[in-house]
UniProtKB/Swiss-Prot annotation:
It comes from Sulfurimonas denitrificans (strain ATCC 33889 / DSM 1251) (Thiomicrospira denitrificans (strain ATCC 33889 / DSM 1251)). NCBIfam families: tyrS. It holds the Pfam family tRNA-synt_1b. SUPFAM superfamilies: Alpha-L RNA-binding motif, Nucleotidylyl transferase. A motif ('KMSKS' region) lies at residues 229-233. Catalyzes the attachment of tyrosine to tRNA(Tyr) in a two-step reaction: tyrosine is first activated by ATP to form Tyr-AMP and then transferred to the acceptor end of tRNA(Tyr). Belongs to the class-I aminoacyl-tRNA synthetase family. TyrS type 2 subfamily. ATP binds at K232. A motif ('HIGH' region) lies at residues 44-53. It is found in: Cytoplasm. The gene is tyrS. This is Tyrosine--tRNA ligase. GO terms for cellular component: cytosol. Keywords: Aminoacyl-tRNA synthetase, ATP-binding, Cytoplasm, Ligase, Nucleotide-binding, Protein biosynthesis, RNA-binding. GO terms for molecular function: ATP binding; RNA binding; tyrosine-tRNA ligase activity.
Amino acid sequence: MLKEAISEIQRGCAEIIDEPRVEKLLKAYFEKGETYTVKAGFDPTAPDLHLGHTVLLQKLAIFQKYGARVQFLIGDFTAQIGDPSGKSATRKILSTEDILENAKSYKEQVFKILDASKTDVVFNSEWLNALGASGMITLTTTFNVARMLERDDFDKRYKSGTSIAISEFLYPLLQGYDSVHLKSDIEVGGTDQKFNLLMGRHLQRSYDVGKEQAVLMVPILEGLDGVQKMSKSLGNYIGVSENPNEIFGKVLSISDELMWRYYELLSTKTLAEIERLKSGVEAGTLHPKKVKEELAIEITARFHSSESAQNAKDEFDRVHSNNQIPTEMDEFSSSEAISITKALVDCNLTPSTSQARRDIKQGAVRINQEKIDDETLSLESGEYILQVGKRKFAKLKVN
């Protein structure tokens, strides 16, 4: 059982620092029933979690299966600074209201994956606000600027003359101090967090906590484009709280090559099962679309239900294979005649009128299933089914 647990925890990890400590904690659980803590921090800088976040969350869920108590840390204090990791400029500071609203949304979403009975949701403002000026000064004496500038992102910005706020130097120290306060045994984070994660080990030594956390780093999941990391701001994401049809359709939109990456990092299938699927596709005995549909059903069911996932597949087949319109879509209304470009924006089918014009020129826009090419078209009184691309539909009533 210990070997199985270690193998499951290692799967998909980009790097593990102090793996012997991880094995020691697991062994103590299996032999003595001793629990241990695994920390992961999330700054609530946006309201929705996406599949990129779930790579880490699924790793936490595996630890819970093997005796861990998860410290799900919401960085409401550190979100006021913004994590500088990988950033080429200082991040915009969020309002307290936005941070609290986003934090509330996180709490509602994480338990689609984590076991609530084995999770402690904590906010780092609780102890960082209490740290005070004196405590903050003590914290800053544990590290120096020369070592801080060893960070690749800081080094590039410093050499290019790009501004680095003093608060950004504080960010890794504050994240590391979270591990001091929580006395975490293990911390899990993305590969872009390595400097911050190691800071936790450093500060646990500096503050004589009596332990140094092991560190597990998981890969950054590529977005739907297969190039850049999944991000809501880039529009290449699949949100945990999106409806079943959206999740299913978005998974099917990824490339065949990216599909295997998603299988490795997001699926609960064993590596042997995934390898059999891959061999079947390479041998021509399995069609890539069928294998992708299997992944789409699994991911959709995880955040909704098996029935919802199957319904999403049926709806997708009906709309895309049989060229029919969806049975359900968002409905909008206009009190007067409206231009097609404004209608597409108002119905949330495109982000801007300029993009709407491009979509029309590219032949991606249909009205009542008929392709249009006139970007000056005005929609008069009546009901319309608007479509952009293969997956975006809306019903518009013009009075």
